[in-house]
Amino acid sequence: NVADVLATLQARDRAGNLVLAETHQRVLSVLRMAEALSQRYAVVVANPPYMGGKGMNARLSSWAKENYPNSKSDLFAMFMERNLDLAVKGGAVAMITMQSWMFLSSFEALRSRILNQHPILSMAPLGARAFDSIGGEVVSTTAFVLENAHKPDYRGAYMRLVNGNSEAEKMEMMAKAIAQGMAA
């Protein structure tokens, strides 16, 4: 993280060391440029691809284990973590994903990160049939918005929309829940 390295180096005073002082200032200058060029977003929105660990080739699996140990079990979960990293402090991440991350033990570390560091602003478990283009009981999904901030006592808004049998029914249920103050 460029910002963390920059903060660490800025905290170190090298003015008294003639050998390091000039190099230290050059490194700080480069890090300031890198920080300015690092893309961060106020809002990150995604419906990520799904690919379980068994579907990954050896190279992708190895990369996932090294770079996303908390979410390596599925590509969608890696997108969750990456999107949280792309959001600015106080920014939002809105996604629709498989709901397996909420229940399976392989996602326990991811859940812990979310629950301890990123308040759930809103969540709507959609269950199966959230997309008419995916027929039947193929995948159970959840839509959610997380904030990239630490608010341990924040209470989000939740709507349970698993009973609808089509996109239209779920949209109608959501509109009704919102109109009634999110009491679905």
Language-model segments: which ranges?
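A generic short-segment signal for beta-strand/edge and adjacent turn/coil regions
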Residues: 10-16, 62-64, 91, 109-116, ...
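Polynucleotide-recognition surfaces of large bacterial nucleic-acid defense/processing enzymes
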Residues: 1-41, 118-124, 129-184
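Short catalytic/ligand-binding loop motif for oxyanion handling, primarily in non-cytosolic enzymes
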Residues: 52-55, 102-105, 152-155
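Conserved Class I SAM-dependent methyltransferase catalytic core
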Residues: 50, 69-128, 144
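SAM-dependent nucleic-acid methyltransferase catalytic core
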Residues: 1-86, 95
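Short secondary-structure boundary/capping segments
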Residues: 58-67, 105-118, 138-143, 159-165
